[in-house]
Amino acid sequence: MRVNLLIAMIIFALIWPATALRAAVSKTTWADAPAREFVFVENNSDDNFFVTPGGALDPRLTGANRWTGLKYNGSGTIYQQSLGYIDNGYNTGLYTNWKFDMWLENSPVSSPLTGLRCINWYAGCNMTTSLILPQTTDASGFYGATVTSGGAKWMHGMLSDAFYQYLQQMPVGSSFTMTINACQTSVNYDASSGARCKDQASGNWYVRNVTHTKAANLRLINTHSLAEVFINSDGVPTLGEGNADCRTQTIGSRSGLSCKMVNYTLQTNGLSNTSIHIFPAIANSSLASAVGAYDMQFSLNGSSWKPVSNTAYYYTFNEMKSADSIYVFFSSNFFKQMVNLGISDINTKDLFNFRFQNTTSPESGWYEFSTSNTLIIKPRDFSISIISDEYTQTPSREGYVASGESALDFGYIVTTSGKTAADEVLIKVTGPAQVIGGRSYCVFSSDDGKAKVPFPATLSFITRNGATKTYDAGCDDSWRDMTDALWLTTPWTDISGEVGQMDKTTVKFSIPMDNAISLRTVDDNGWFGEVSASGEIHVQATWRNIN
């Protein structure tokens, strides 16, 4: 026993010096970073998220989880140029062709990072994603991202959707602390086989604790509210159907229309911030050039207004704390320039958006969001519209298939406007459909697509004779004539003296829930569970022999 022990001790003594001399990465543990505050934007209008500094930028927790209309695509002004990311506060540069790992200890969420963030238009970055993919990811981070040549790259990790969802549910005023590990090496290891930067013979490994506090939560509310606006050749607006909180208004010497366009809630921990700016921007460059700054104005209370002029006028975060809405004023000249440019029959979500700029974070501080409400702007001469009688963009229904169950009914208002009544008005329903036994049916599907269930559908309206006319309309994309509907006529006179009329009627789209054919799938199998479908209703009008 004593001999064996001696041999073991000798072997240990021989091996130990070799182990002690082995090369390794250089590990640096930085002092804890100062705690930082962030503002979280929950965008229910566009279904995405945005996080931005409430104070100092570093350590970074900044950017959106989705591209917006401000994404830079290689030309024009550079606004949004990367998706959201984090770093340890030192903004450390990376070496070309080296490998990079980033992982979190005490991560607030599983799978927090997707890869190496880069600026999308820099050489070596992906213009579409602003992401350099790693060889692998796990519950803590990503590994084996090769630093491409070209533009600068830094130790930045792109945030996953799971990270944003964690930030969303955090109460305002709460904090989290995580340890960020960032490691780069020139060794060409295979991360997909389990190798890691920290285990290589050379490189630099940085460790730092960072703390972030949720200082505010801005929730942009999609009200789904809808309103029609008809404009004449001089730009004078006339409100049609809808509930988007609009009214005619005069501001100074300009008359026009003002509407509540954004609804929001803003919770804070008392944060004071003036670097966050919010303002509207016209999406059509020709229209933006044609109108004056005061032809479009915006307000937090509907009485005190600021002109729209790129980034020159804005409301700050601090100003937004005392309100819950943003109003927009459109002058008659604004609408007149739309007419002159041939911009008509347009949705305001395609006409302008709101921009969010945090001047503290120039690379990731740009964001864009849609309005909460929608205006459908149409010419008063020769136009047709259809909107839900609930004044919502996306009406929906749900029900059960069984004997005696009520149909899913959708009501709509159809409006025509012209110098005379339309000579012909047509309507059709489009959506998933299948012909069974010579009849077209709307097809509802399960989430996995395995169950496809046929449903009959009808369009009906009251005729001028007081009778109800019903069409079989199984989502078949075929036009039906509704010219003989009972129209309510309202005359109008243009500022030029020309006369015309606005005609309105109602139509109902129904999907019976008690038809026996819906008890089985299109393959004649029984089914159980939930199925759904979406479709559209279209209208068109024709005027003939108009001088």
UniProtKB/Swiss-Prot annotation:
Asked if the record carries the keyword RNA-binding, the reply is no
Provide the protein's localization: Fimbrium
Signal peptide limits: 1-20
Specify where it is mainly localized.
other
Q: Where does it sit, as one GO cellular component term?
A: pilus
The protein's UniProt keywords, in alphabetical order, are: Fimbrium, Signal
Which residue ranges traverse the bilayer? none
Keyword Signal present in the record's keywords: the answer is yes
Inducing factors: Negatively regulated by H-NS. Positively regulated by IHF and EcpR.
State whether it acts alone or in a complex, and with which partners, per the record: Forms polymers. Interacts with EcpA.
Q: What does this protein do?
A: Part of the ecpRABCDE operon, which encodes the E.coli common pilus (ECP). ECP is found in both commensal and pathogenic strains and plays a dual role in early-stage biofilm development and host cell recognition. Tip pilus adhesin, which is required for assembly of EcpA into fibers.
**Which family does the entry's similarity section mention?**
Belongs to the EcpD/MatE family.
Q: What is this protein called?
A: Fimbria adhesin EcpD
Q: Which organism is it from?
A: Escherichia coli O127:H6 (strain E2348/69 / EPEC)
Q: What is the lineage of its organism?
A: Bacteria, Pseudomonadati, Pseudomonadota, Gammaproteobacteria, Enterobacterales
